[in-house]
């Protein structure tokens, strides 16, 4: 597309949005979303979509609310004052029960990597459902072995032995057992701000306040300082493996990083004071997801892994959110840190929303587990899950989604970084590939989190304009952006304009 045509197209979108004061949502994908309570300049034309959803003919909205209140656990909370009742999905689009269309920039919590209801994945699932759903792993079936061969080919030596399970929590739970069985030690370390699951075992690894219980959830899990170069005590303008750095000043030499060295000293302090002289392991997300897309200084994980191994521990990379090409430059997040874990856990994007997860390790660690217990999962590695998993890997390769994550992700990061320059309440824009965090602050000097009520309103405004993003951070102060990996630059442009309008609207409210 030529520059002149792009300019003409942008002018057309602007002219269209100014002419349309209010449009009722219809069931056609060509319709524009109705935007209540927002000023005219905040309305933006959605990118085109050639899919029309089915007419919603299920439960009335109020009936859904009543069922949710009476019969679903109160821990099942939803975004927004009026939660969305979603009806259908197509690639990067979601449709609610009223026919409104939304651009999904959170992918079901960083899960729907190849797009909602991708036709190839759907066709494979239907074909396998007609053939064989479930046997349990006490019988052989080709989908499991085909998938194991495909997945192992994407991992470096010696990470070649695969345990198939059903969720990220279950995968990390098993990884904890593996680490303790192999090392014959107990203590496991994880970062503050880490999220590794909500099972009774993994709750000890998870260090985000709202997920912690008032009673002991597990033993021998210790936290260490998260090397957060924006919110932490140290950080500069060259720390991150990202096209966008923090606004903090940096006096480091070109070949050094003072922030990294200081965070390593904190890690050593944890090893020297909070755990036994020999430990079982260390868990790390290559980029923290739930904590708001937090990146560490370059080389930190590499040095931390070496220190852990000196204590007899194994190193576990939690790739539940970062794996399968989402970060763009590499297929796995640990590869971006130039390091090699002993165990890798994965879920979410592995099945594009179908319940599936895996733990991958070395033959030596796998053998040690077999000597300690007979591990078994009734549903892990089912024919249906494995067929879907193979289809997801094929789509990622055939559609060059890792390359798209790199190209469009870099474009998105650089574009959203402009908001940090324009708005004082945007403290940081960070990330890699199609995993981006936008941290909201009261001001850039104090870096104090923007109050949750204000972040909520910005979130609501984005939704009202047809954009769905996630939330993260210990104070829910960070917007998490992780669209399906097939997202286009045109869709990024729309998301940027919506987000910018939501921020402008917020500043107007503040000024009143």
Curated annotation (Swiss-Prot):
Quickly give the catalysed reaction.
glyoxylate + L-alanine = glycine + pyruvate; (R)-3-amino-2-methylpropanoate + pyruvate = 2-methyl-3-oxopropanoate + L-alanine; 3-oxopropanoate + L-alanine = beta-alanine + pyruvate; 2-oxobutanoate + L-alanine = (2S)-2-aminobutanoate + pyruvate
Q: Does the keyword Flavoprotein apply?
A: no
Acetylation is among the record's keywords? yes
* Gene Ontology CC terms, in alphabetical order: mitochondrial matrix; mitochondrion
- Which EC class, in a word? transferase
**Cofactors, names only:** pyridoxal 5'-phosphate
Q: Tell me where it resides.
A: Mitochondrion
Q: What is the activity's pH dependence per the UniProt entry? A: Optimum pH is 9.5 for transamination between L-alanine and glyoxylate. Optimum pH is 10.0 for the transamination between dimethylarginines and pyruvate. Optimum pH is 10.5 for the transamination between L-ornithine and pyruvate.
Q: Where is the transit peptide?
A: 1-39
**Residues with the N6-acetyllysine modification:** 55, 69, 82, 260, 415, 418, 452
- Which residues are annotated with the PTM N6-succinyllysine? 69, 260, 302, 415, 418
Q: Name one GO biological process term.
A: glyoxylate catabolic process
State which Enzyme Commission number(s) the record gives: 2.6.1.44, 2.6.1.40, 2.6.1.18
Keywords associated with the record: Acetylation, Aminotransferase, Mitochondrion, Pyridoxal phosphate, Transferase, Transit peptide
What does the record say about tissue specificity? Expressed in the liver, lung and kidney.
The disulfides recorded in the entry are none
- Give the molecular function GO annotations: (R)-3-amino-2-methylpropionate-pyruvate transaminase activity; alanine-glyoxylate transaminase activity; beta-alanine:pyruvate transaminase activity; pyridoxal phosphate binding
What positions belong to coiled-coil segments? none
Q: Which protein family is named in the record?
A: Belongs to the class-III pyridoxal-phosphate-dependent aminotransferase family.
Q: What does this protein do?
A: Multifunctional aminotransferase with a broad substrate specificity. Catalyzes the conversion of glyoxylate to glycine using alanine as the amino donor. Catalyzes metabolism of not L- but the D-isomer of D-beta-aminoisobutyric acid to generate 2-methyl-3-oxopropanoate and alanine. Catalyzes the transfer of the amino group from beta-alanine to pyruvate to yield L-alanine and 3-oxopropanoate. Can metabolize NG-monomethyl-L-arginine (NMMA), asymmetric NG,NG-dimethyl-L-arginine (ADMA) and symmetric NG,N'G-dimethyl-L-arginine (SDMA).
Tell me, how does this one assemble?
Answer: Homotetramer.
Query: What is the protein's name according to its record?
Result: Alanine--glyoxylate aminotransferase 2, mitochondrial
Question: Which gene carries the instructions for this protein?
Answer: Agxt2
């Amino acid at each position: 597309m030529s520059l002149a045509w792009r300019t003409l197209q942008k002018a057309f979108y602007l002219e269209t949005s100014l002419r349309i004061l209010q449009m009722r949502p219809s069931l056609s994908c060509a319709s524009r979303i109705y935007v209540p309570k927002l000023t005219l300049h905040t309305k933006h034309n959605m990118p085109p979509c050639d899919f029309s959803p089915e007419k919603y003919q299920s439960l009335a909205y109020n009936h859904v609310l009543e069922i949710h209140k009476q019969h679903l656990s109160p821990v099942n909370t939803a975004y927004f004052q009026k939660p969305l009742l979603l009806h259908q999905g197509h690639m990067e689009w979601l449709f609610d029960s009223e026919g409104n269309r939304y651009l999904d920039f959170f992918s079901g919590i960083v899960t729907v990597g190849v797009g909602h209801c991708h036709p190839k994945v759907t066709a494979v699932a239907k074909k396998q459902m007609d053939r064989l759903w479930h046997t349990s792993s006490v019988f052989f079936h080709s989908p499991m072995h085909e998938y194991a061969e495909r997945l192992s080919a994407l991992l470096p030596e010696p990470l070649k032995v695969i345990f198939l399970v059903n969720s990220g929590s279950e995968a990390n739970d098993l990884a904890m057992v593996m680490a303790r069985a192999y090392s014959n030690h107990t203590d496991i370390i994880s970062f503050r701000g880490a999220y590794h699951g909500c099972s009774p075992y993994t709750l000890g690894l998870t260090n985000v306040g709202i997920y912690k219980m008032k009673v002991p959830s597990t033993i021998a899990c210790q936290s260490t300082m998260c090397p957060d170069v924006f919110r932490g005590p140290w950080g500069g303008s060259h720390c991150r493996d990202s096209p966008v750095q923090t606004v903090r000043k940096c006096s480091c030499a070109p070949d050094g990083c003072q922030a990294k060295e200081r965070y390593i000293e904190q890690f050593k302090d944890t090893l020297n004071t909070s755990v036994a002289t020999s430990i079982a392991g260390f868990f790390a997300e290559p980029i923290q997801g739930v904590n708001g897309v937090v990146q560490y200084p370059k080389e930190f994980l590499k040095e931390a892994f070496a220190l852990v191994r000196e204590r007899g521990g194994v190193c576990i990379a939690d790739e539940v959110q970062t794996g399968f090409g989402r970060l763009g430059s590499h297929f796995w997040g640990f590869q971006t840190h130039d390091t090699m874990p002993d165990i890798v856990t994965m879920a979410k994007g592995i099945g594009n929303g179908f319940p599936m997860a895996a733990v991958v390790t070395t033959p030596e660690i796998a053998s040690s587990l077999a000597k300690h217990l007979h591990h078994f999962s009734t549903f892990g590695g089912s024919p249906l899950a494995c067929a879907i998993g193979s289809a997801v890997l094929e789509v990622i390769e055939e559609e060059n989604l890792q390359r798209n994550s790199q190209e469009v992700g870099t474009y998105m990061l650089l574009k959203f970084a402009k908001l940090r320059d324009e708005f004082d309440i945007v403290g940081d824009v960070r990330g890699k590939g199609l995993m981006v965090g936008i941290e909201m602050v009261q001001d850039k000097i104090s870096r104090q989190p923007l109050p949750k009520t204000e972040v909520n309103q910005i979130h609501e405004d984005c939704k009202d304009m047809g954009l769905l993003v996630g939330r993260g951070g210990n104070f829910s102060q960070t917007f998490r952006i992780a669209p399906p990996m097939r997202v286009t630059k045109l869709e990024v442009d729309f998301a940027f304009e919506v987000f910018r309008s939501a921020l402008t609207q917020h500043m107007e409210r503040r000024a009143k």
